[in-house]
A protein has these predicted regions:
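Short metal-coordination and nucleic-acid-contact micro-motifs, chiefly zinc-binding Cys/His arrays
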Residues: 188, 405, 476, 516-522, ...
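N-terminal, positively charged nucleic-acid-binding surface of large information/translation enzymes
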Residues: 2-272, 339-344, 349-352, 356-371, ...
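Acidic, turn-prone loop/beta-hairpin segments
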Residues: 100, 189, 193, 200-207, ...
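Short cysteine-rich clusters marking metal-coordination/redox-active sites
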Residues: 192, 409, 480, 520-526, ...
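Cys/His-coordinated zinc-binding microdomains
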Residues: 196, 468, 484, 527-528, ...
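Core structural elements
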Residues: 145, 168, 463, 656-669, ...
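C-terminal accessory/binding modules appended to enzymatic or scaffolding proteins
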Residues: 321-322, 885-920
Length: 930
């Protein structure tokens, strides 16, 4: 308190604590983690809450192939805040972390590590290398999660490669197959030529690509309905005009699709006629830079052209004109190039007309002999050569270079293609209505998630669940050697599941089909009993989509359905959806009661983080500089339902906010030195009014914090805590009570200490889910009463109402604080005029009307002076002083009369009344003498 040394300094109760001002979190946090591990904090917490209602937050498994990033940190910390809060709110809230361990990225890294040896390695050997790679990264990522303060059963995480998980996954597959929800068929699927495998919609990302969009004309060869003759158009000079951005698919063309409801025109250019949608004639001519053209005759309904025939542009074959509702007038010519092997709409309409499905592209994206002279060329290279040849042949009407959004593989980030292949599918269409009903039963947070999920389910195709790779759970299907029919029965599923539960899915590659399939199984089609095994594996989304069965139903500490799934917004097409589909298909209900969604982490300018751009921030860097609690505070301070900004400046600002919260706790701890809550707490009737106000402010904090935690709005909790610490405590209550705390030893001091103790105990519990390290450090320094736990996370959250004040009391103190603010303005003016220095040099006269006088007079004058932090306050009825914003109040300030007390620094007329202490006021002299 005093700047200059005084003989009375030692008589003051100045704050004293070993709780450091500088947090030093990077050094302290690891020691706390070691203590938590040593004392088995997580398992003891779950035991502590045994018998309480369960709250199950089911962890979406991150992919086990690298270090965590800020997005992973955001995800895990949100979950940890929820888990800690629920355990403090009267629930038993277990947290079982999981890891997604199969899939292409791990397989590709394993292959890369083998170099030339990969040519000679067996599938079983490759799988063993993949498992080793995944396991190593599970350990790395687990340590990184724990460093963030995340608590959970990291000793027993769920892993999609575990035998018991794989066995349950096989059973889910079997349940769906039994209901007819899984089938094998030829369909166009997303195909990555570089990874040589099919992809699901969830494995697609879109990026901007350049390409040539071309208008190609196909020469009419047959007119069975006599449409051309009817309109006087010569068939040998007539063409259909199509538009495409995928030149490489032209070898697969088997049809041209028109919309039967549209009108089409004959456009004469020179001596030749071109058929295109009437509404698109001008845009086509503009794109092709053709100025001289003529529309001949009346428009013709698209339906009239059905089943006309045309010559392929370069192959010796003919195609058919067909009709489809998917043809629009948004772009192109209204005549759609149709290659059933390379597009879903194309495939469906081709099936309707029994048009051949041609796929002249192999697994690696090279054209086959079906493409004629272009065989062997990769599709992207073939674009140029085909275009050049067609231009030379006069088949190209126009060409426009465009930029457009094109699908890419999320693994290798290269462009992908649509390619019809034999694949395994989940028939979403079969149970789509049931999925809609399940979506309606779920609480979506934010609530737009409901419509987003419904829209995605409505628009999606059947789910391609097979992959042509090695590292994953095998498709448990057998094939008849005689007729080739696939074979899946209850008995085969049971046998495969039992084998996998015992030996893991590697067993599929160890044994021949006859060693796995139960004896007595016969082909339902031909009665034969010799078998081969399927060589595909399941989509990893089927792996993680099976956790509701393999984890929630299998782990005794968990339950189905989960109370919550919580992941990023990309999981609407990923884990949220795959889990929903498999659960509805197998069990008829959603696997979750609620879904909470968070946004992406972006840089300080709102841009995506990329290593190449140098705008990334790594969790390890922030932990090294500031500590994990600052990352946790960043999470809590953010509106994570939208994209969350992160950067060094943001963390620097948050460290300042953290310092203010920490210093509030430090000030209170310093003033609790020597305070024993078991013996020193005073009764409520011995508290001063300002103490009651502080506790009422605490009650408001408890209410607001609970309201935030209950709806997972941690931003609301953070702001409530920050404002309480800075505005209510540091700027007001703690400042006002300094004289009581430092200069007295009686009931008044103990009343302030009692109040502060109650405040810090409650405040520390409130911040515990967020600042898990700092709250425990505070807890360690807090004096304890009987029944308090060693770890703050074992405590119950404070309940609202214990310190609540009525509206009249709150209104009174709102007005008192308003009066104080007006006094501070006048003191600032006096300080500027150099009539006073510190506020304790002032004496304040308050001119009041009756209402304000009664308000202020209800507070003892010494407490009122402390409230204003001045040496003296005088109340005068009537007008005077400087006008203020408080109606009926005028304020005047002057230098206080009397002398300055050497100990408390207040000015008083009774300085020196005690002969032994001539420089002290009467109060301080009596304290020193006591």
């Amino acid at each position: 308190m005093a700047k200059n040394k005084s003989q009375y300094d030692s008589t003051l109760n100045l704050p004293k604590t070993l709780f450091e001002m500088r947090a030093g979190l990077p050094k302290k946090e690891p020691a706390m983690l070691e203590d938590w591990e040593k004392n088995d904090l997580y398992n003891n917490l779950i035991k502590h809450n045994d018998g309480k209602p369960k709250f199950v937050l089911h962890d979406g498994p991150p992919y086990a192939n690298g270090n965590i990033h800020m997005g992973t940190a955001l995800n895990k910390i949100i979950k940890d805040i929820i888990i800690r809060d629920k355990n403090m709110e009267g629930f038993q809230a277990p947290y079982v972390p999981g890891f997604d361990t199969h899939g292409l990225p791990i397989e590709l890294k394993a292959l890369s590590s083998l170099g030339e040896k990969k040519k000679d390695i067996s599938k079983l050997e490759l799988r063993q290398i993949c498992e080793k790679f995944a396991t190593e990264h599970i350990d790395i990522m687990s340590d990184q999660f724990k460093r963030l303060g995340v608590i959970g059963d990291f000793e027993h995480p769920y892993l999609t490669l575990k035998p018991e998980f794989e066995a349950r996954q096989i059973e889910i597959f079997g349940e769906m197959a039994k209901k007819g929800d899984i089938y094998k068929g030829l369909k166009p699927v997303y195909w990555c030529p570089d990874c040589r495998t099919a992809l699901a919609e969830a494995e697609i990302e879109y990026g901007e690509d350049d390409c040539d969009s071309i208008f190609v004309r196909f020469h009419v060869s047959q007119d069975p309905n006599g449409v051309l003759a009817k309109h006087g158009i010569p068939m040998d000079k007539t063409y259909f005009v199509i538009w495409t951005t995928t030149t490489w698919t032209l070898p697969a063309n088997e049809a041209i699709c028109l919309n039967g409801a549209f009108e089409y025109s004959f456009v004469k250019i020179g001596e030749e006629y071109h058929i295109m949608a009437t509404e698109l004639v001008k845009s086509v001519m503009d794109a092709c830079h053709i100025e001289n053209y003529e529309i001949v005759g009346e428009p013709v309904s698209g339906a009239e052209f059905e089943l006309m025939r045309y010559h392929h542009v370069y192959l010796p074959k003919e195609g058919t004109v067909i009709l489809g509702d998917h043809v629009t007038l948004e772009s192109g010519s209204g005549c759609v190039h149709t290659a059933g092997g390379h597009g879903v709409d194309d495939f469906n309409v081709s099936q309707k007309y029994n048009v051949p499905i041609t796929v002249p592209v192999d697994d690696g994206g090279c054209l086959t002999e079906l493409a004629g002279k272009y065989a062997g060329q990769r599709v992207w290279a073939a674009n140029k050569t085909i275009l050049a040849d067609l231009t030379e042949a006069g088949a190209i009407m126009g060409q426009v270079h465009i930029k457009h959004q094109y699908p890419h593989c999320w693994r290798c980030h290269n462009p992908i293609i649509f390619r019809a292949t034999e694949q395994w599918f989940c028939s979403v269409a079969k149970f789509r209505d049931d999925v809609y009903k399940a979506i309606d039963t779920v609480k979506w947070m934010p609530d737009w998630g409901h419509d987003r999920m419904k829209g995605m389910v409505r628009d999606r195709n059947d789910w391609c669940i097979s992959r042509q790779r090695t590292w994953g759970v095998p498709i448990p299907a057998f094939y008849c050697k005689k007729c080739g029919a696939y074979h899946i029965t209850d008995a085969t599923i049971k046998a495969v599941s039992a084998l996998f539960r015992k030996e893991g899915s590697d067993a599929w590659y160890k044994y021949e089909a006859e060693q796995i399939i139960p004896a007595g199984e016969v082909c339902e089609k031909c009665g034969a009993s010799e078998w081969t095994k399927d060589t595909d594996i399941m989509d990893v989304w089927f792996d993680s989509g099976s956790t509701h069965a393999a984890v929630l139903e299998e782990r005794p500490e968990l339950s189905f359905p989960a109370d919550m799934y919580m992941e990023g917004g990309d999981q609407f097409r990923g884990w949220f959806q795959s889990s929903l589909l498999t659960s509805v298909a197998a069990k008829g209900c959603a696997p979750y009661k609620s879904v909470l969604c968070h946004g992406w982490v972006v840089d300080e300018q709102g841009k995506q983080m990329h290593k190449s751009a140098g705008n990334g921030v790594e969790p390890s860097e922030i932990i090294k500089d500031y500590g994990a609690d600052i990352i946790r505070l960043w999470v809590a301070s953010s509106d994570y339902t939208v994209d969350v900004r992160a950067g060094k400046n943001i963390f620097k600002q948050l460290s300042e906010a953290y310092r203010k919260i920490r210093n509030t706790a430090r000030f209170i701890l310093g003033n609790l030195d020597g305070f024993d809550p078991n013996t020193d707490c005073v009764a409520d009737d011995q508290l001063q009014e300002i103490d009651r106000w502080a506790l009422a402010a605490l009650d408001d904090l408890i209410v607001n914090a609970k309201a935030g935690y209950d709806v997972y709005d941690f931003n609301k909790v953070y702001h409530a805590v920050y404002n309480f610490c800075v505005v209510a405590m540091s700027n007001f209550y703690l400042d006002v009570t300094k004289d009581r705390l430092y200069c007295t030893n009686g009931v008044g001091r103990k009343a302030a200490q009692t109040t502060m103790y109650k405040i810090l105990v409650a405040l520390d519990k409130i911040i515990a889910p967020i600042l898990c390290f700092t709250s425990q450090e505070i807890w360690d320094f807090l004096p304890k009463t009987e029944g308090m736990n060693k770890y703050v996370v074992f405590e119950a959250m404070p309940k609202a109402g214990q310190y609540a004040a009525d509206d009249a009391f709150k209104a009174k103190w709102a007005q008192l604080i308003a009066v104080r603010d007006e006094v501070k303005k006048v003191l600032e003016q006096a300080r500027a005029e150099k009539s006073i220095g510190a506020s304790l040099e002032a004496s304040v006269t308050l001119y009041c009307n009756d209402a304000v006088y009664d308000l202020l007079n209800s507070i003892p004058m010494d407490e009122l002076a402390d409230l204003m932090i001045v040496s003296h306050v005088e109340l005068v009825k009537g007008e005077g002083g400087s006008a203020s914003a408080v109606e009926g109040l005028g304020v005047a300030a002057a230098h206080a009369t009397g002398e300055k007390c050497e100990r408390c620094w207040k000015y008083s007329a009774d300085i020196g009344t005690h002969a032994a202490h001539p420089t002290l006021c009467a109060r301080c002299a009596s304290v020193v003498e006591a």
